[in-house]
Amino acid sequence: MRPSGRTPEQLRPITITRQYTCHAEGSVLVEFGRTKVLCTATVTEGVPRFLKGKGQGWVTAEYGMLPRSTHSRMHREAASGKQGGRTLEIQRLIARSLRAAVDLTKLGENTITVDCDVLQADGGTRTASITGACVALADALNWMLAKGSLKTNPLNFMVAAVSVGIYEGAPVCDLDYDEDSSAETDMNLVMTETGKMIEIQGTAEGEPFSQEELMQLLELGKQGIQQIIQHQRQALA
């Protein structure tokens, strides 16, 4: 039995609130149960130096957690002037996932930066960030289209993510903190709405997992992501 009483395939309640802030070209508050992440997409003219003159754009991301987004206060990374390894890993994952969905040649020499700020953490902050970031990105691209900065929409498909794992010997989907902290296997999946994989991150925290269990987790995650993308599409409708 899962601590929350959910069935193995059951996701936490998901809410996606668009236009959550008034300044950003795209802004979304995404909630997976008690995990809440604010995702804002900012459009700027120009591209990084390595892309200048190539006629394409760039999509990047930053990730951070508020000091009291967790059970006890975390040290604010900005105060130390250095981002931690986990932060860098997650923001690169978010950026890679978003770029996989975009035709950068249709973006022109523009950059979209998506900031993902965790307001409250209860497991799955990186997967919630990717899910919300894609909606914020879609809104930013629609803003550019309405402004006349783009001729066609560069977004090829939606992207979403979910965590899966083996908890007390059983495969489960969308782990909360209680499950994640004691899972035998922890895995993050990023997929497109067409069912293709973008990233698989998996680790046996306790007992090694079999190929059969891996396939079960992938199928569980695929089903979960299909439901999450429905939430994205409903939010954008």
UniProtKB/Swiss-Prot annotation:
<dbReference type="GO" id="GO:0000049">
    <property type="term" value="F:tRNA binding"/>
</dbReference>
<dbReference type="InterPro" id="IPR015847">
    <property type="entry name" value="ExoRNase_PH_dom2"/>
</dbReference>
<dbReference type="Pfam" id="PF01138">
    <property type="entry name" value="RNase_PH"/>
</dbReference>
<comment type="subunit">
    <text>Homohexameric ring arranged as a trimer of dimers.</text>
</comment>
<dbReference type="GO" id="GO:0008033">
    <property type="term" value="P:tRNA processing"/>
</dbReference>
<keyword id="KW-0698">rRNA processing</keyword>
<dbReference type="GO" id="GO:0016075">
    <property type="term" value="P:rRNA catabolic process"/>
</dbReference>
<keyword id="KW-0819">tRNA processing</keyword>
<dbReference type="InterPro" id="IPR050080">
    <property type="entry name" value="RNase_PH"/>
</dbReference>
<comment type="similarity">
    <text>Belongs to the RNase PH family.</text>
</comment>
<dbReference type="GO" id="GO:0006364">
    <property type="term" value="P:rRNA processing"/>
</dbReference>
<dbReference type="InterPro" id="IPR020568">
    <property type="entry name" value="Ribosomal_Su5_D2-typ_SF"/>
</dbReference>
<dbReference type="InterPro" id="IPR036345">
    <property type="entry name" value="ExoRNase_PH_dom2_sf"/>
</dbReference>
<protein>
    <recommendedName>
        <fullName>Ribonuclease PH</fullName>
        <ecNumber>2.7.7.56</ecNumber>
    </recommendedName>
</protein>
<dbReference type="InterPro" id="IPR018336">
    <property type="entry name" value="RNase_PH_CS"/>
</dbReference>
<comment type="function">
    <text>Phosphorolytic 3'-5' exoribonuclease that plays an important role in tRNA 3'-end maturation. Removes nucleotide residues following the 3'-CCA terminus of tRNAs; can also add nucleotides to the ends of RNA molecules by using nucleoside diphosphates as substrates, but this may not be physiologically important. Probably plays a role in initiation of 16S rRNA degradation (leading to ribosome degradation) during starvation.</text>
</comment>
<keyword id="KW-0808">Transferase</keyword>
<dbReference type="GO" id="GO:0000175">
    <property type="term" value="F:3'-5'-RNA exonuclease activity"/>
</dbReference>
<dbReference type="GO" id="GO:0009022">
    <property type="term" value="F:tRNA nucleotidyltransferase activity"/>
</dbReference>
<dbReference type="InterPro" id="IPR002381">
    <property type="entry name" value="RNase_PH_bac-type"/>
</dbReference>
<dbReference type="InterPro" id="IPR001247">
    <property type="entry name" value="ExoRNase_PH_dom1"/>
</dbReference>
<feature type="binding site">
    <location>
        <position position="86"/>
    </location>
    <ligand>
        <name>phosphate</name>
    </ligand>
</feature>
<feature type="binding site">
    <location>
        <begin position="124"/>
        <end position="126"/>
    </location>
    <ligand>
        <name>phosphate</name>
    </ligand>
</feature>
<dbReference type="InterPro" id="IPR027408">
    <property type="entry name" value="PNPase/RNase_PH_dom_sf"/>
</dbReference>
<keyword id="KW-0820">tRNA-binding</keyword>
<dbReference type="Pfam" id="PF03725">
    <property type="entry name" value="RNase_PH_C"/>
</dbReference>
<keyword id="KW-0694">RNA-binding</keyword>
<keyword id="KW-0548">Nucleotidyltransferase</keyword>
